[in-house]
Amino acid sequence: MPPKLRNFDKSMEKYTDVVLVVKQERFYVSRAILSEHCTYFQSLFCGDSNYQEHIISDVEPQDFQKFLEVVHGEPAIFEATVQKILPLAQKFGSKTVLQKCERFLITISTVRLSTKWNLAKQYGLDELQAHCKLEFKTAQIVRKNPQPEPKSLAYSDKFIFDHSFEKVDGLAEGDMRRSQPITHLDFTWTIYITRKNQHLRVSLCCGKAHLTSDWTVRADFKMTLTAKGSPDLVSDTKGFFHLDSEKNFYWELGQEVEWDEIRDKCLADGKLEVETRVRIVKIRELPVEEFKPPRIVTVNAVKSYEGVLPPTKVLFGDFPFPKALAKEKPDYSDYIRVTPLTQQAKTSAPAETPDLQTPPRQQASAKPQASPAKSAGAPQLPQKVPLFPSGGAPSSPSAPEAPSEPPPPKIYPTLGANAPPAPPVQGKKFILKNVFGNVEAMKCHTAMACQKAVAYDFEWNLIISQKNNRLHVSLCCSKSNVTSEFRILADFELIIAGKNGGRPLKSKTNGCFNIEKTKNSSQELGQDVEWSTIVYDYMVDGRLTVEAHVNITRVTCLDAPKFKKLRNFDATGNSWDVMLIVAGQRFFVLKEILISNSARFKNIISKINFTAAPSTEIKLPDSSADHFQNFLEACYGDPSINDDTVHGILKIAQSYEAAGIVKRCEEYVIKYSKKTLEQKEKLAKHHNLKTLKAHCDYWKSRRKCC
């Protein structure tokens, strides 16, 4: 049996009003607490309130000790005690204890499923019964399909490796450095850094020795650049590494950071420390003999195809040449159609499928001839062709005649004083549309924005910016004179109109806009597109038409309380003998509960003469009334500790020396919290939680060993 978490011996006689005798062992408890949680004791104490002792039969003292600990909010439910506590909870009619045992059996317990089912039926635990039924169905599916799908090899693994680059401050424009490669799951992994266009690209490369087949490796990875005296620079990337056996070609994925930011924040004596945490999601081998249809490029879209060809997934990520294998007649509505730039033999597409051999940028201009030297190496972008004036045509006779251009749409000046105001938009669904002028003259690190429209009490507008030979198209949400913090969840689709009536470029995003409590707060979300793609396929006489279809799904005010009250501490319908005043709000509580949980309240209450004033007011120092509400609920044994309330409860508990509540909060963060390791470590340092700090240190050391 686990050790005692709370004493109910003679030392508590001064603060209790009734004694329960269980097989000659005496438990000093409070009538009010037991009556609050148990219908049995509510009836027992109702008749004769002056009787000081009651005998409890057919109960073991050690089991009753654990039951009382759970009633008083202690974490006393374990594998060794749950089946002892359940019959007492049913005997004494305690719904709170039954719910805690049920939650333990669902989320933590490792006993057999049949044992859980029997306990659920015996004690009427409906949620546990539903959980067991779901587990039974899952087990039946596993038994029916014991063998994995043979078509693809699936691996799931995580690893971390880091490297310290020396003399990074001496990198010249175009210089590249790489780390020593490591081998994991028969693949080699290398970190690259490259300085180009006043940026430093930090990337991860995946390769394989003796490449005889094509491979795709799906991986999610986080790259951390250690900063000096400021938060580290962290970037998350999800993508596919494609290994081409024919060209012996490897992929690299990564992010770009401004060189000035790297130099000012991350370089210490010329050293740059890079840590990469990689999670391999899936590895698939594509044998050479498999038929390879024409390749297509997708922009931020993920689709799966199953048909005549082997089932594959669209490859996506931050790399210049995403590729995919399509089935015979796929839907090309969301794709930009191009030809493999180093294709050796021209293949003709079926008549039913769209023309995949001539990309839109080459249908309106002469197709540049690729040199044999470039064809033998990695894929290269087509040479930049000059832009022709309105109505003009390229000089190449092989290009088809361009269709007549429709009348130009009305152009709104961007960020101009004379721009017509956008009409107000009503409802949760709306469309923003703007024609940006003189886009071809945009320089690097410049931006244009359209007029703002009002929807759902927030201001919305479209923004385009040029950076690193890419055009960033984004939707911006803002609000002036913000008095509260807001979080806006929205689904939106950005559409760039095609050139000469061509296929538009679409990208869908599920975004969260965070509006902070400042004078003018805004946030933008969007997508990046290659600048050459914009120039050749979507820009008409320097104009670019952008449209956003927005659906606001949820607006949350972060200043609103993140919890609902589990218990009302008002004067009606509540047993109380002392009133606490916190930030002007009154809490009617029992002094026995305060004394049993808090050493500071024990000291305060011991100095008050309750004989002269049976119901006394105690005014406490100002603090958050919401946090104090959660703290009192925890003292009463309610499950009020969660990720949203744990910080506030810890603050109040440490202020009033409630060691038991602090211990429960610490145990919750270690066992149940979904906070990140960094957030847990910050919480441990802020509240000086030694056990939680040791827990975080242990898992940090495990990370470094991986």
UniProtKB/Swiss-Prot annotation:
Keywords: Repeat. Pfam families: BTB (PF00651), MATH (PF00917). Residues 344-419 are annotated as: Disordered. Residues 165-280, 455-552 form the MATH domain. SUPFAM superfamilies: POZ domain (SSF54695), TRAF domain-like (SSF49599). Residues 359-380, 389-402 have a biased composition (Low complexity). The keyword Transmembrane helix does not apply. Residues 16-80, 576-644 form the BTB domain. PROSITE patterns: BTB. InterPro entries: BTB-MATH_domain_protein, BTB/POZ_dom, MATH/TRAF_dom, SKP1/BTB/POZ_sf, TRAF-like. This is BTB and MATH domain-containing protein 47. It comes from Caenorhabditis elegans. The gene is bath-47.
